[in-house]
């Protein structure tokens, strides 16, 4: 399982993210159980330069904070377990300080996109075109 990859597919953009089993094992396990996951990516409201998918209707295991941070860089995928608000996955396309209207929140960094050269384009599309369909899966 050490070299497992999360595949993220939008309309025309595809990303491959290495799961961080050594740093966030419970989060990786919980995410695997909900795959394949389809939904819509939207622009973050409070956090900066990122897109996110709401997991509100998805049955996902409770996980502790692990490998958690408030600040993430381009391509560092995080899972917010929903302790203060809804559960979500966030993909930064630049710097993110994960927050809600209640303030800053730590989230679990569980995967990192290997080639993030197109991630800024994903951010641009979400801003200019609106919601983007997405599929998360393991191949």
Label the predicted regions:
Residues 19-139:
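Glycine-rich active-site loops that engage anionic ligands at enzyme catalytic sites
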Residues 1-23:
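N-terminal intrinsically disordered, low-complexity, charge/repeat-rich segments that act as generic
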